[in-house]
Structure formats: structure tokens, C-alpha cells
A protein has these predicted regions:
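Long, structured stretches of catalytic cores involved in phosphate-ester chemistry, encompassing
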Residues: 1-154
Length: 154
């Protein structure tokens, strides 16, 4: 069981793709980024890494996550349950004798300082819970979107 986190405040690859993946004459753009139904950029690289090329391209074309997941490659990256190349925030880890719980807490892109003392708005909070497993068994992870919308990350 492992979790990898990136930077809390530095721009990541998903944000860079908004600027370096040009819309014109770029047939591979949909693998990295596409606009949703409201015209906001979405990191289709999350879909590509978890579900495959067809899923990313389907989302870029249809703007429909369910259609994109319907054409997923279930053999791709079976070890990944969550991937957010454009998230900002932090993770907490709690471990006791029977369970490990990791929560990813994501905030909107921090373009300016939050005026409140509460740290500002939340984009999503996703919990990954793994009960203790026995030698020779595979760990079983339960993922729950506790708050917000994790978008293309799940």
C-alpha cells in the first residue's frame, strides 16, 4: 500500500497542459486536457493514467464521464485507485492496530490567499481505508468521496 503526493502550492503538469497543449492542430490534446460542458479545463491525463487512452479521448469528445468510463481499459494500472495530476492540498494518515486511513484534502487552485482563518473553500476530500490484512493476502482498499467532487481523479 503506498500513496504519493506532490506539491501543495506549485503548479503541476495538469496546469501546465492548459498552456502548452494548444487547441489547434493538436490531435493528442485530449489525452492531457479538455474542456468540460461549461468550457472549464479538465485534466484528462487523470483518466488516461487510470483508465486508458480511449477514456481520455471519449471524455474530450463527449464531455461525459460515464461514457468515458464505459470504454475504460480494466487491465490498465490495476494498482491505481486515485490519480489527480492537478490537485492542491494535503493528505492525512491515521493508523491503528486494525486500519490505515489516508485522506486527500484538495483545495481550489491557490491563485490568491484565502481571506478567512478556516483555510478557504474545499474542492474535495477523498478517504482511502485499508483494514489490516494477513500475510499472503492482498490488502483491500475502500475509497469514499467524503466531500465535494473529485472530478476525473476517481
Amino acid at each position: 500500500m503506498s500513496f504519493v503526493g506532490g506539491s501543495m502550492i506549485s503548479p503541476g503538469g495538469a496546469e501546465a497542459n492548459e498552456y502548452n497543449q494548444k487547441k489547434e492542430n493538436n490531435p493528442t490534446r485530449g489525452l492531457y486536457i479538455a474542456e468540460d460542458k461549461d468550457g472549464k479545463p479538465q485534466p484528462t491525463v487523470n483518466l488516461m493514467m487510470r483508465h486508458g487512452v480511449r477514456s481520455a479521448l471519449e471524455y474530450a469528445s463527449s464531455k461525459d464521464l460515464q461514457k468515458a468510463l464505459a470504454v475504460r481499459n480494466p487491465e490498465l494500472a490495476p494498482h491505481l485507485t486515485f490519480y489527480d495530476a492537478g490537485g492542491h492540498g494535503y493528505a492525512t494518515v491515521r493508523v491503528d492496530a486494525g486500519t490505515m486511513v489516508t485522506e486527500f484534502v484538495c483545495i481550489p487552485r491557490p491563485l490568491e490567499r484565502s481571506p478567512g482563518v478556516d483555510g478557504g473553500p474545499l474542492r474535495y476530500r477523498v478517504r482511502h481505508e485499508v483494514p489490516l490484512w494477513q500475510a499472503g493476502e492482498r490488502p483491500q482498499m475502500r475509497q469514499t468521496v467524503v466531500e465535494g467532487d473529485a472530478g476525473l481523479a476517481v
